[in-house]
């Protein structure tokens, strides 16, 4: 459960990251593909080389969806319903991959935000990304 303070920290951190969605998203995906190569199986039609147009485009989509989740933090299930359906029924993505990508997003935010990515911000974002992952995995149950 996110506290009011968590939500404030998430919003503040997101304000700093929002203008870098394509860059940060591509970096998080590239990090995931490198660290967890099994995740590449979901992208057989992509050029997965770092900085490719497809990785950048999908990275922008991923972080755009995350931005939507930040805006709708009090109603994640409704805000993420379409993505949850897509990943569960059409793409059939193993839900463990949401956690793997969440870890990579955390690293990218920490690298780019530096000292502004305090332990408190890290903890709040960890809870938030866990909540987003849980919502995306809801349809699997």
From Swiss-Prot:
Range of residues in the leader sequence: none
Key words, A-Z: Heme, Iron, Metal-binding, Oxygen transport, Transport
Ranges for domain Globin: 1-141
Tissue-by-tissue expression: Red blood cells.
Gene Ontology biological-process annotations: cellular oxidant detoxification; hydrogen peroxide catabolic process
Pfam families: Globin (PF00042)
One MF annotation (Gene Ontology) recorded for this entry: heme binding
GO cellular component terms attached to this protein's record: haptoglobin-hemoglobin complex; hemoglobin complex
SUPFAM superfamilies for this protein: Globin-like
Binding site for heme b: 58, 87
Role this protein plays: Involved in oxygen transport from the lung to the various peripheral tissues.
Similarity comment: family membership: Belongs to the globin family.
Subunit structure: Heterotetramer of two alpha-D chains and two beta chains. The component D forms dimers of tetramers upon deoxygenation.
More info: Ref.6 chain was isolated from Hbm, the least abundant of the four early chick hemoglobins.
Name recorded for this polypeptide: Hemoglobin subunit alpha-D
Native organism: Gallus gallus
Gene from which the chain derives: HBAD
């Amino acid at each position: 459960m996110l506290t009011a303070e968590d939500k404030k920290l998430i919003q503040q951190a997101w304000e700093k990251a929002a203008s870098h969605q394509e860059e940060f998203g591509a970096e998080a995906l590239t990090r995931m593909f490198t660290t967890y190569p099994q995740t590449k199986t979901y992208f057989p039609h992509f050029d997965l080389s770092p900085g490719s147009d497809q990785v950048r485009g999908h990275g922008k989509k991923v972080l755009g969806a995350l931005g939507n989740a930040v805006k709708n933090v009090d109603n994640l299930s409704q805000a993420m319903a379409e993505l949850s359906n897509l990943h569960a029924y059409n793409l059939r993505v193993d839900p463990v991959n949401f956690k793997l990508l969440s870890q990579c997003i955390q690293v990218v935010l920490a690298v780019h935000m530096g000292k502004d990515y305090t332990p408190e911000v890290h903890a709040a974002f960890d809870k938030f990304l866990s909540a987003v992952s849980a919502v995306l995995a809801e349809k699997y149950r």
